């Protein structure tokens, strides 16, 4: 009898949690719909919104194999997805972008947290759903024209699939590898740099299998599925411009973040890394720029270390304040952030940009990193599944961080993996909350 009562109470608790896991993303989605109805045009341009629309214009005029320069300078993936929506309605395109991205984000949040709720990590499902659904920067970015929030949703789907796959250790299903590979394929279709993060996650996942054969099969299936994305982008450029590339801006991006006098941000100072064209050519190709920058890093270890520190600070910098560095000036949060009104007065500007503001900004940067690694430490100690979640989450964040160090220091680059960094940070916060509550 006692067992039945205990089980009934447990079921009731699980049902209550499930309702919250549905309610948070749904309420956030409704808030976004209301927000869209009060925004001129139904949404916002992201940091590169105009350039994405230039790509859509080229595709809309000439089709998939448009020769528009923007489609080979930058990866064509995200503009292609927008173009498909434009074929439905060009006049309501921004509304369609906001609605589709918001639905996807809401579903991914639910899918991840619902799977977590069925494991030893059920205790973080509630706060993770709450903080991700209502994080003003990450969640509201679904209303902006940009790949960042959809990529964050893709990573949530991948982690949810991994959790679902490992819940039943006795069952090996190849479909999980296909699905996970497909989501990383979508993420890297929008921004190829996240292909590397996906591959690291697959490796970590595969190594958790006692059977090396099963682990190898899983990794290979996920990898092959993922590689369909860059293959498609390369094929498009081969047909369109007879060039086997995904994009031609990597060298430019790396050059901006390197040099003797610069600090690694977009506002570079001093001369660029010297790079001489290979004869008989008189111009430097993008690939040659990449090689020149890599050589500069290797031959200037002290300067490379200093730049790495600067870029790390920029990567974790606040969205506003005296230490801000990056391309998030169109961050939806800044439209309602209290500091934005505060700096309009001289006394407020002195407070925000003075010693007090700098202290708060440094505490914000250090706090993010400390909570990230503390959350990682907490989750790794629970059981093999939570260890896998911790390893997969941190690996994606660190890869994104390292890519920023290798290119440009920009706080926007942390947004696509912010769903995973929030999971670790919220785990740290919730664990501390439990300890304080228990102590009191």
Residue ranges and their predicted role:
Residues 47, 73, 96-104, 130-157, ...:
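Multi-pass, polyprenyl lipid-linked donor-dependent membrane glycosyltransferases
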Residues 129, 176-191, 201-203, 225-228:
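Membrane-interface alpha helices of multi-pass inner-membrane proteins
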Residues 96-120, 153, 157, 161, ...:
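Transmembrane-helix motifs of polytopic, lipid-linked glycan transferases
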Residues 92-96, 311-397:
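Membrane-interface anchor segments at the N-terminal boundary of transmembrane helices
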Residues 111, 150-168, 179-184, 201-203, ...:
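Specific aromatic-rich, kink-prone transmembrane helix
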Residues 72, 76, 80, 88-107, ...:
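Loop-to-helix entry region of an early transmembrane alpha helix in multi-pass inner-membrane enzymes
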Residues 35-61, 218-291, 295:
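Juxtamembrane membrane-water interface segments immediately following transmembrane helices
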Residues 48-59, 69-90:
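Short hydrophobic/aromatic helix or loop-helix immediately within or flanking a transmembrane segment
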